[in-house]
């Protein structure tokens, strides 16, 4: 197997909603034709209509993608590796809550209930809540994504 010095990222324009299908077809073609010039196929989760290929050159991308039904073409230019990692990495903006804050539970079995934050476990991305709307004190641990601060 050759060690290729240059690896660039190329973007395929595809029909929206068909990104996974195109990626699977590309993967199958790469395996069956034993193509060593394509190193990875990336489907960005938040961007519809595009598939990213890590390859040695645009000629390889055009060759492997020719004849696939939902491929519209190769976008002009290259994209940087930092942009690819930004598209792929999961970055969720977690609500900023601290001990003593009033929050509302937005999902799960306690959805819609008001609660007070007892403790924030930032390593686990969880909060321990005291549900205010129950007749007796109930403490529950929920993921941080399931609460939002109450605006007052």
UniProtKB/Swiss-Prot annotation:
It comes from the Archaea. Signal peptide: none annotated. Residues 99-129 form the KOW domain. GO terms for cellular component: ribosome. Keywords: Transcription, Transcription regulation. InterPro entries: KOW, NGN-domain, NGN-like_dom, NGN_dom_sf, Rib_uL2_dom2, Ribosomal_uL24_CS, Spt5_arc, Translation_prot_SH3-like_sf. GO terms for molecular function: structural constituent of ribosome; translation elongation factor activity. One of its GO terms (biological process) is transcription elongation-coupled chromatin remodeling. It holds the Pfam family Spt5-NGN. SMART domains: KOW (SM00739), NGN (SM00738). Stimulates transcription elongation. NCBIfam families: KOW_elon_Spt5. HAMAP family: Spt5_arch (MF_00950). Belongs to the archaeal Spt5 family. Heterodimer composed of Spt4 and Spt5. Interacts with RNA polymerase (RNAP). This is Transcription elongation factor Spt5. It comes from Sulfolobus acidocaldarius (strain ATCC 33909 / DSM 639 / JCM 8929 / NBRC 15157 / NCIMB 11770). The gene is spt5.
């Amino acid at each position: 197997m050759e060690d290729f010095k240059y690896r660039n990222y190329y973007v395929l324009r595809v029909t929206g909603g068909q990104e996974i299908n195109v990626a699977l077809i590309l993967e199958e073609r790469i395996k069956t034709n034993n193509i060593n010039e394509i190193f990875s196929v990336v489907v960005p989760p938040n961007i519809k209509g595009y598939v990213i290929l890590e390859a040695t050159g645009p000629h390889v991308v055009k060759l492997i993608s020719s004849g696939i039904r939902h491929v519209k073409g190769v976008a002009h230019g290259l994209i940087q590796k930092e942009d690819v990692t930004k598209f792929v990495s999961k970055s969720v903006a977690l609500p900023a809550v601290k001990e003593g804050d009033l929050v509302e539970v937005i999902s799960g079995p306690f959805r819609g209930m008001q609660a007070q934050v007892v403790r924030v476990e930032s390593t686990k991305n969880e909060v321990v809540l005291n549900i205010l709307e129950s007749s007796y004190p109930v403490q529950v641990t929920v993921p941080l994504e399931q609460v939002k601060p109450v605006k007052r």
